[in-house]
């Protein structure tokens, strides 16, 4: 997409229609890269597909897992990708050549895994029916540190009786990398010190299980998805006292939610519905009002992600494994690129001047042939601290 030909004042804040469907294997989980150039898709057979969003073609296919991919996580530089699978393994991939940097075999199937924001050799993993682990890989040798699940406060009798059933379902790093944020099956939200693996603070967000926690692009808010059918947004500017801002739910139908997240600006939140609804709900975060219901596929939508730059949403179909993309159908404004360009409402008859197609001299013709016109323009990156990683193309002979 050529950004210079788009009218910035005509772009809405959220997608409006289903525009593209991607299909390569049966997808289970997806994530956009931090710069928005690529989309990582984990498949049910253990493969990982990297999509090029400029051409909607496959850039790489990574094979290393033997069972379904549970989660994919990009590094901050977009060069590395961490994948977690039901085969009890986590693999870090180098997308420059598709090689494996390291792989770690854990003690149980992995719910999800999240990279450290600044260190690619450190990640945290949430395991099935076991305590989460902080893994640090030094010289190819992983060091495991178990993270706590139960809060360091007095619990009532029923909580003590069901202590064995209290497990961590989701965990990831704070943007600073100093803390690990986790959610449990009893609705507890923990802030864990990454250096000491001790709980700094615990807060009861809900009485039901916390299925998912996502971080906003501005790194100041969290969105919680729990089994009580309520989506909550929480401010984490003060980690010792997180504040629940808004609650989103379908009061009439009492829908359960599969996945949720923030828009790229943080002004909207979205969630996919469970079972029969086949839609994505979009709310305005400030007012809490429902602004859009994205429909189209005739199947349940599981994982969902919002593009980091454009108002674009990608989601995975449960039955077919296809990737559906909702976006805004943009009309390129050539007058924004060339001020003297005139747009016509309808065709007009053109009167040809007598000398328009006269033969020019050979000197002018040779100068035109020697003049090189670039048809590809790479826009500069906003960050001056580090140039973004650009994945080299993979040429395959058919």
Curated annotation (Swiss-Prot):
It is found in: Nucleus. Pfam families: WD40 (PF00400). It comes from the Eukaryota. The keyword Nucleus applies. Keywords: Nucleus, Repeat, WD repeat. The Set1 complex specifically methylates 'Lys-4' of histone H3. This is Set1 complex component swd1. It comes from Schizosaccharomyces pombe (strain 972 / ATCC 24843).
